[in-house]
């Protein structure tokens, strides 16, 4: 009888029915059904000693298994990074973008420009109180990319406050909260933009310019 359609079954069968040792088994997968990482992880778990990967998952058709994804799969399965420096993942992504000109989709896990960005005020409020409320891991420590916010009509006072605190590098004791006059004034201005028909997120340049208009002395910090 044919083996079931199963990565686990294939790896198990090769080892136990064909006597192929683990060290001779490696998995080469693509992402045609959004199962690239799941299949590669399953191959590891069932005895394949290696999985083939490519940086950023670049490959034929839907791409190969992303190397950066399997770094974190390895850590989650083994409980250790075994000396791997995960901040290099961000450096690799920056090189691909800035030197090669490769366009990384913004929502790509770990390396996309929006992977740890929120526009929702309720999320920003959580970030202000305790980053672990919103982020599943410390993106600053692990990838040298702190969680951040973009300002839109859903950002609210919390989103504006978080953006100002992060953009201007305010430390504990000097951070602005939702009651700050500057935060309130900025939020009212943002709301007006969307009431007037704006559809896109606010840019950093626009926000900084408005802060210069509202609080010139404060704006000098950034």
Feature locations, PLM:
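Conserved, mostly hydrophobic/aromatic
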Residues: 47, 70, 164
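Catalytic cores of alpha/beta
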Residues: 33-48, 65
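Active-site-adjacent beta->alpha loops and helix N-cap segments on the catalytic face
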Residues: 1-15, 61-69
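A mid-to-C-terminal "edge-of-domain" accessory segment
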Residues: 79-222
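Hydrophobic faces of well-ordered beta-strands that scaffold small-molecule active sites
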Residues: 23-29, 51-53, 70
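C-terminal helical cap(s) of enzyme catalytic domains, especially alpha/beta-barrels
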Residues: 59-85, 89
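Alpha-helix-loop-beta-strand connector modules within alpha/beta enzyme cores
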Residues: 7-26, 72, 78
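Glycine-rich phosphate-binding active-site loops on the catalytic face of alpha/beta enzymes
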Residues: 46-66
């Amino acid at each position: 009888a044919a083996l079931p359609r199963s990565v686990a079954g294939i790896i198990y069968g090769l080892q136990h029915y064909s006597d192929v040792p683990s060290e001779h088994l490696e998995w080469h997968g693509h992402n045609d059904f959004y199962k690239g990482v799941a299949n590669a992880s399953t191959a590891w778990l069932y005895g394949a000693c290696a999985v083939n990967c490519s940086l950023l998952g670049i490959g034929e058709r839907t791409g190969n298994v992303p190397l950066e994804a399997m770094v974190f799969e390895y850590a989650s399965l083994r409980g250790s990074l075994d000396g791997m420096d995960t901040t290099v993942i961000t450096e690799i992504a920056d090189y691909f973008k800035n030197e090669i000109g490769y366009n990384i989709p913004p929502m790509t896990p770990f390396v996309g420009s929006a992977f740890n960005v929120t526009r929702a005020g309720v999320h920003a409020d959580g970030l202000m109180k305790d980053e672990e409320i919103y982020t599943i891991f410390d993106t600053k420590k692990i990838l040298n990319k702190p969680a951040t916010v973009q300002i839109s009509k859903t950002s609210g006072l919390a989103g504006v406050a978080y953006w100002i605190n992060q953009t201007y590098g305010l430390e504990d004791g000097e951070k602005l909260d939702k009651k700050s006059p500057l935060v309130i004034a900025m939020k009212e201005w943002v709301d007006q933009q969307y009431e007037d028909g704006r559809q896109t997120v606010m840019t950093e340049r626009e926000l900084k310019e408005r802060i210069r208009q509202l609080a010139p002395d404060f704006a000098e910090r950034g």
